[in-house]
Amino acid sequence: MLSLQYPDVYRDETAVQDYHGHKICDPYAWLEDPDSEQTKAFVEAQNKITVPFLEQCPIRGLYKERMTELYDYPKYSCHFKKGKRYFYFYNTGLQNQRVLYVQDSLEGEARVFLDPNILSDDGTVALRGYAFSEDGEYFAYGLSASGSDWVTIKFMKVDGAKELPDVLERVKFSCMAWTHDGKGMFYNSYPQQDGKSDGTETSTNLHQKLYYHVLGTDQSEDILCAEFPDEPKWMGGAELSDDGRYVLLSIREGCDPVNRLWYCDLQQESSGIAGILKWVKLIDNFEGEYDYVTNEGTVFTFKTNRQSPNYRVINIDFRDPEESKWKVLVPEHEKDVLEWIACVRSNFLVLCYLHDVKNILQLHDLTTGALLKTFPLDVGSIVGYSGQKKDTEIFYQFTSFLSPGIIYHCDLTKEELEPRVFREVTVKGIDASDYQTVQIFYPSKDGTKIPMFIVHKKGIKLDGSHPAFLYGYGGFNISITPNYSVSRLIFVRHMGGILAVANIRGGGEYGETWHKGGILANKQNCFDDFQCAAEYLIKEGYTSPKRLTINGGSNGGLLVAACANQRPDLFGCVIAQVGVMDMLKFHKYTIGHAWTTDYGCSDSKQHFEWLVKYSPLHNVKLPEADDIQYPSMLLLTADHDDRVVPLHSLKFIATLQYIVGRSRKQSNPLLIHVDTKAGHGAGKPTAKVIEEVSDMFAFIARCLNVDWIP
């Protein structure tokens, strides 16, 4: 590999912070100011090295051309019914943003209802959340620009898709819940702050409030319905009960699956919604999660993990809400995790379980909880569902590593409940029958069995020669289920690659127990699980360290960076997207404080001692052995990422280049690409997605000497 000349970067050796008696040097703290001329110059100097490096990768053009060709397939969501009309999202293939269509009936002509593509020249304005009024006649929708979490809410009259003048600003992480009379909507916003709020700022997000907006009035007249002045981190999202009588307020403090649950009986608000609501504190602790399903009068059905880490379904009668009086409707499964529930056709419950990282879909009786039917499903994931209490039909969407998507429709008024294929998509150019998916269970360091999916061409020899791409996440109770990825299948097809996805601890694959096994004091388990996945792939002959790439984003960016520090000998290439790299300071920026539920916080001495051991920024060291260097590393971030602010990646790359990059033995590149008009990933336009994956796989090909197979 050619040796790269990294920029000379100023180190402020006087920037030292004391953590519980430990002096920690932070020489690149000046990179925390995104607006300083110095930071802008740093970003420009880094991009000046990285962009040509990526553009000179021999296969980049071939990869981008193939990606553009194969990604050009139709993408549909499930149909969903609102009032008397049906709606669905559709992307013809390469549109930057998907378009919302409306139909008067399932057989009727489809018309464009909302096309976000016309809101910007480059596709960087995206739809972020929407809500229809109960009768389906009004539509509220959130827009975000350049990938930021900040949202502007606008309104439309559905008939004729007529734009209304109402606009709501300073909205972020918000609910959108209409009262059933269609007069207005609950939403969340943050107080005004100094400086800008466009997604390039790093200021912390505290004191979120709940407001009610009356349609046709100015935002300045909105009614404050809930606030928590003594609890700045609390966030309270509202939803209306199915009968429209109750407002349910779900209060969260971080990212743990726990919430308080308060409610207000709107019939008790004699003057309507006119101020802080009369909240009844049904659950006033953070000891479990309560997810509203439906209610019959005062008997409310919830999905909960209270004393049931795999979740169960319970009934609570608001007239007699003592925990000892709760009734179990569907008990917790000993192994499978209940992911979500919906009530449909007034007396049915649809339950979706996760069984060894594969979905199961069931129909139960709302009154007795009894199982009525299990829907037939291949091995894969349910990625879409629609069907509410007043509907008599459901739609659900299935996908897997080798199937882009099948949408099923089931009419629940029929005697025999047989789902039919409503729509099936194929991708021309990738023949699924040439490939196979296997799921294996490998032992981690402490003996725990970890599931991993492996996708490869049929009939390959396990001789250690294949390039492999290992992906992981491992945090925040999020399960990584099979999904269809054209970019990764191109790697398998045209780069002779092996795709592996490791379902490490910290995720939700086996419920709250699995999540707790990879957070706080147990965070090292995530890194051990992932390193053992790599060792399994090598031992079984799928790949070898020099041919192995690891990849993750956000919490997964932290994962792959920590693994590179701990085992630089185990990987050939590391691609860390929008990663959390400074574990001592993450809680100070934007919404970082919410992640302390998974990571802890350096303000605590005990937590500091966990964090400083694995924080990527604080554990970069030149490997001692002469024949070991750091893998090739590419960090990806963006100027409008206000979820994981770019300073994490900027400080980490400066540290890598200084400590490792100056060494003679480090011939593998250590690079960063900072994108513009992009954020953490939600709403990213197709054109940017194609550029990003072309960069990633071109980097892999160049660094690991992978040839293109036509």
From Swiss-Prot:
The N-terminus is blocked. One of its GO terms (biological process) is angiotensin maturation. It catalyses: Hydrolysis of Pro-|-Xaa >> Ala-|-Xaa in oligopeptides. It is an enzyme of class 3 (hydrolase). It is found in: Cytoplasm. The active site is at S554 (charge relay system), D641 (charge relay system), H680 (charge relay system). GO terms for molecular function: metallocarboxypeptidase activity; oligopeptidase activity; serine-type endopeptidase activity; serine-type peptidase activity. The modification N6-acetyllysine is found at K157. Its EC number is 3.4.21.26. GO terms for cellular component: cytoplasm; cytosol; extracellular region; membrane; nucleus. This is Prolyl endopeptidase. It comes from Homo sapiens. The gene is PREP.
